[in-house]
């Protein structure tokens, strides 16, 4: 799987960072999923190879505008791009009427079926290759994280089962390897029943706003990637007197270290953190605070940067 960050700023955009949006890209590269859709997300997409036509589903973590205000515009552009495939949007129930009324009031016609599903009722969303579940987080409003788990990754034929059932080698095996249903000796065989994963499924967690990382304990242990907000550093919190429902880099890093997370990606940085090394506070303050508590692979997400989760288990920036 790959991650491509479309927005990494908290609350408001900056010249270098847009507000929250993260693309999760299937290992095959053919389809992708969007977590959160802050204002201007569709503009960011224009600077990537991602196509709205290949978007399988949208997941919104919570109701705050920096995570959802880009949704109506993105949907309208999807319609104007000629998309015809249904699109499922999993989002807080309170936003459903807002989306529908916005489209009606703006006389926006969608040539595809828009399916709005309440995130509060989501047990598991599935495609052919991924399962998505939720974990409840802690914020000023209800917020969730989305857990992406691969289904049967890089499937290969279960030769032992085929031999055990006496299914003769030949062209039929090739059909089964494609997951097709075939007839053998008068019986229907579903190819998916004869495929097994060639490696363990990978698990990637993309979180909404959260001030209690420990709520992720059950799903984060041994996770391949945890994407979590680090809105502040401890030094800033000590000056401002509160986190306003957000986490510091130190809090997230300590949790990730204890949970054994292989790759920690920090995002959703306060606009006060500068990229200019001559100004303070600097974004490196976030990195330094996290590194003091976390020994795994640490990444500070950058807008429009794509990251690849390789076979070695490391998440690394793509060229």
Swiss-Prot record:
Keyword flag Cell membrane: no
GO molecular function: 3'-tRNA processing endoribonuclease activity; zinc ion binding
SUPFAM superfamilies referenced in this protein's UniProt entry, alphabetically: Metallo-hydrolase/oxidoreductase
Gene3D superfamilies: Ribonuclease Z/Hydroxyacylglutathione hydrolase-like
EC number: 3.1.26.11
Cofactor note: Binds 2 Zn(2+) ions.
List of residues binding Zn(2+) 2: 66-67, 209, 268
Binding site residues for Zn(2+) 1: 62, 64, 139, 209
Catalytic reactions on record: Endonucleolytic cleavage of RNA, removing extra 3' nucleotides from tRNA precursor, generating 3' termini of tRNAs. A 3'-hydroxy group is left at the tRNA terminus and a 5'-phosphoryl group is left at the trailer molecule
Pfam families to which the protein is assigned, alphabetical: Lactamase_B_2
Domain of life: Bacteria
Coiled-coil boundaries: none
Function (record text): Zinc phosphodiesterase, which displays some tRNA 3'-processing endonuclease activity. Probably involved in tRNA maturation, by removing a 3'-trailer from precursor tRNA.
Subunit structure comment from the entry: Homodimer.
Family assignment from sequence similarity: Belongs to the RNase Z family.
This protein's name: Ribonuclease Z
Organism per entry: Pseudomonas putida (strain ATCC 47054 / DSM 6125 / CFBP 8728 / NCIMB 11950 / KT2440)
